[in-house]
């Protein structure tokens, strides 16, 4: 690590500790040339996740957008807020574990539907009606019949 005082390239670590959030490590270093001490921080570099929309447009993944969409589907349903946030946490964790830089919005939509189906069928159908863009009542009816057959 380059010393900010004399620009020497070698230093030794004299103290290391996690920050309060445990997202980085604070290190106190001592320059081996001039003896001055300085602080550095080490953290994992986050690679932003890009979502590829149906029209091909790309935008940054937005946790709040996902949460809002699921909350609309669950409106006036007996689903605790903690459960909805757990769904978003699970999806976000799964996306991070995929180690991809880009993901299709359709893949995220399928992940949401998979989870909502197990939580509340009405919320599932509401989400599906927007996500699958039902154009008429027959498509909506087919989705309901498919859901009933699985039960």
Curated annotation (Swiss-Prot):
Classification via Pfam families: ATP-cone (PF03477), Zn_ribbon_NrdR (PF22811)
GO MF terms, alphabetically ordered: ATP binding; DNA binding; zinc ion binding
Zinc finger (unnamed) residue numbers: 3-34
Entry's Gene Ontology BP terms: negative regulation of DNA-templated transcription
Cofactor note: Binds 1 zinc ion.
Cofactor requirement: Zn(2+)
InterPro entries xref list: ATP-cone_dom, NrdR-like_N, RNR_NrdR-like
Domain ATP-cone: 49-139
Domain of life: Bacteria
Keywords carried by this UniProt record: ATP-binding, DNA-binding, Metal-binding, Nucleotide-binding, Repressor, Transcription, Transcription regulation, Zinc, Zinc-finger
HAMAP family cross-referenced by the UniProt entry: NrdR (MF_00440)
Protein function: Negatively regulates transcription of bacterial ribonucleotide reductase nrd genes and operons by binding to NrdR-boxes.
Record-stated family: Belongs to the NrdR family.
Name recorded for this polypeptide: Transcriptional repressor NrdR
Organism: Halothermothrix orenii (strain H 168 / OCM 544 / DSM 9562)
Lineage: Bacteria, Bacillati, Bacillota, Clostridia, Halanaerobiales
């Amino acid at each position: 690590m380059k010393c900010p005082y004399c620009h020497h390239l070698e230093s030794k670590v004299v103290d290391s500790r996690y920050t309060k959030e445990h997202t980085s490590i604070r290190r106190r270093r001592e320059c081996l040339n001039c003896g001055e001490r300085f602080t550095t921080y080490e953290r994992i570099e986050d690679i932003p996740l890009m979502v590829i929309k149906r029209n091909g447009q790309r935008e940054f993944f937005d946790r709040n957008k996902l949460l809002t969409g699921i909350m609309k589907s669950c409106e006036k349903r007996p689903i605790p807020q903690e459960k909805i946030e757990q769904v978003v946490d699970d999806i976000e964790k799964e996306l991070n574990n995929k180690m991809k830089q880009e993901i299709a919005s359709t893949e995220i939509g399928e992940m949401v539907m998979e989870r909502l189906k197990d939580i509340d069928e009405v919320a599932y159908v509401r989400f599906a009606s927007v996500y699958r863009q039902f154009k008429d009542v027959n498509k909506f009816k087919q989705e309901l019949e498919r859901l009933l057959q699985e039960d």
